[in-house]
Structure formats: C-alpha cells, structure tokens
C-alpha cells in the first residue's frame, strides 16, 4: 500500500527527526505530567507551552478499536482496499492514541485488545514513517 511522505513543519520536526532515528518521542508537559500526540503549541490539558519537552517512549500499545475500509472513494491514495484502520492506545499514557493500517495484518483479522509495537517503515530513500504492528 503506498504511503504518504510526511513533510515536517517546525512543530513536528523533533518527532520526525526521532522517527528517522527509529525512536518514538512525544511531547510531555512538565506542568501536568501528560504526554500528547500530535504535537501542538501548548499542552492540551493545562495549556502550558513553557513546560513542553520531548520524551522518548517505548512504542508499545494495544489495539483499542478497528474498522475495515472497503470503499474509500474519497481516499484515492490508498488503492489497496479493503484495508484496516486501527486505533492504538499507547501503554505509556492511555490518553494518547495513534491510527494505523497495521501492516502485515489482513483485513477483518485485527485482534482488538492485542499488543502492538511501533515499527519504522522506509517509504522513500532515507524517509521513514512510524507504523504499528501486532506484537509477536
């Protein structure tokens, strides 16, 4: 399945720089001890911008929910249909979610509740993205 190549902006650059090093980092608020994704100018909870830093997390989570896209007419960049769309809840902070098509997991075979791990996939020479795969 073809993947979009992300273009980092000043706010997301630390995230994508870490992905290129095969690491997962998230913004962390020192004021309320919360992780957040996607990156924002201020904490989603306490609205502090001064206390935001980047924190490495272990990249483990669980599948919270899943659907199968069978006819994504509006999404022509995903020609391989049907495909999974799973919501992954991060173990390090259950309030942080990611979305993934779970490469390697066939449509309709997503084990909701299963453990997943972040994986890094090369989508162009020298260009990595983060994905989630069901843990072995």
Please identify what each model-predicted range represents.
Residues 1-26, 133-135:
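A broadly conserved sequence feature marking short terminus-proximal activation segments
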Residues 22-25, 39, 57-59:
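Short metal-coordination and nucleic-acid-contact micro-motifs, chiefly zinc-binding Cys/His arrays
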Residues 27-30, 41-44, 111:
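Cys/His-enriched microdomains
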Residues 33, 47:
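Cys/His-coordinated zinc-binding microdomains
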Residues 60-62, 115:
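Residue-level marker of beta-strand positions
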Residues 63-103:
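Glycine-rich active-site loops that engage anionic ligands at enzyme catalytic sites
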Residues 93, 98-136:
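Well-ordered alpha/beta subsegment
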């Amino acid at each position: 399945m073809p993947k979009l190549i992300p273009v980092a902006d000043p706010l997301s650059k630390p995230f994508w720089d870490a992905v290129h090093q095969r690491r997962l980092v998230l913004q962390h608020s020192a004021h309320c001890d919360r992780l957040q994704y996607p990156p924002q100018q201020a904490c989603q909870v306490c609205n502090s911008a001064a206390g935001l830093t980047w924190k490495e997390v272990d990249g483990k989570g669980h599948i919270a929910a899943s659907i199968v896209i069978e006819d994504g007419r509006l999404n022509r960049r995903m020609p391989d249909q049907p495909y999974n769309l799973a919501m992954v809840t991060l173990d390090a902070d259950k309030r942080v979610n990611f979305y993934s098509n779970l490469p390697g997991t066939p449509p309709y075979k997503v084990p909701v509740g299963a453990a997943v791990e972040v994986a890094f996939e090369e989508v162009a020479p020298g260009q990595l993205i983060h994905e989630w795969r069901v843990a072995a």
